[in-house]
Structure formats: C-alpha cells, structure tokens
Curated annotation (Swiss-Prot):
InterPro entries: Asp/Glu-ADT_sf_sub_c, GatC. Keywords: ATP-binding, Ligase, Mitochondrion, Nucleotide-binding, Protein biosynthesis. PANTHER family: GLUTAMYL-TRNA(GLN) AMIDOTRANSFERASE SUBUNIT C, MITOCHONDRIAL. The keyword Mitochondrion applies. Allows the formation of correctly charged Gln-tRNA(Gln) through the transamidation of misacylated Glu-tRNA(Gln) in the mitochondria. The reaction takes place in the presence of glutamine and ATP through an activated gamma-phospho-Glu-tRNA(Gln). This is Glutamyl-tRNA(Gln) amidotransferase subunit C, mitochondrial. One of its GO terms (cellular component) is glutamyl-tRNA(Gln) amidotransferase complex.
Length: 125
C-alpha cells in the first residue's frame, strides 16, 4: 500500500536523510525589555509570566536550530500535495459591498476595523 502511494515522481526523499542539528540549548537567550514590549504589541500576547518567557526562549532556540540545517541538496516543494493536480478557479468576485453586514457580526469595531482581544488576555465585558 505504501509503495503504491510513493510510486509517483517526488522530490521528497524516500528514506530519512541524516542531519546534524547544532546544540543551541547551551546558547543563552537574552531578551531585553524593549524587545519584549515590541513582541507584546505586535503579537497581542502578554509575556509577563515566566512560563511565557520560557516558551518564547525555547521557540527562539528551536528556530535557531532549524535555521542552521544544511538544505543545499534539497529541492523546494511547491505544495505538500505534489502527487495531486490542484484545481484553480478563476478569481471572480460574485458578491461584494457587504462591509456593513460583516461589521455587524463583530462584538467590537473601531471605524471600519474589527477589534480583537489580545491572545492571552480576556476581553473586558
């Protein structure tokens, strides 16, 4: 069954490719308060807790680890569904001018924009 699925031409290696990942856990991640404030403003996520900062630091270490992977001989994929023909449709507007109707669906708006609560801070009632 698996062999039948993999019989199409593919750029994905059929066997695991060994890769050496650098150990980034020994590199201390230092984030200054200005960077934290900027990230909070851009992401709408409160980073005041130690758990949030630890998650941010581990995410940075993971990104640093995968950024150093050698991809010299890896062909790029255009889609993960490379064995299927993707059907595209013409981009034609069939309905429009419904801004007011859509804005009425939101709990809060400001001018013609939706107002969303920060990611981990409850919206005040």
């Amino acid at each position: 069954m698996v062999a039948a699925l993999l019989s199409h031409p593919t750029k994905v290696p059929q066997t695991p490719v060994p890769a050496a990942f650098p150990d980034t856990s020994k590199n201390p991640i230092e984030i200054d308060t200005n960077t934290i404030k900027l990230l909070e403003r851009l992401s709408l996520v409160d980073l005041d807790s130690d758990q949030a900062l630890d998650t941010l630091k581990s995410s940075i270490q993971f990104a640093d680890k995968i950024a150093n992977i050698n991809t010299d001989n890896v062909q790029p994929l255009y889609t993960v569904l490379e064995h299927q023909q993707l059907q595209l449709r013409n981009d034609q507007v069939t309905a429009g001018n419904c801004r007011e109707e859509l804005l009425r669906c939101a709990k809060r708006t400001d001018e013609d924009y939706y107002v969303s609560p920060p990611g981990n801070i409850p919206l005040e009632q």
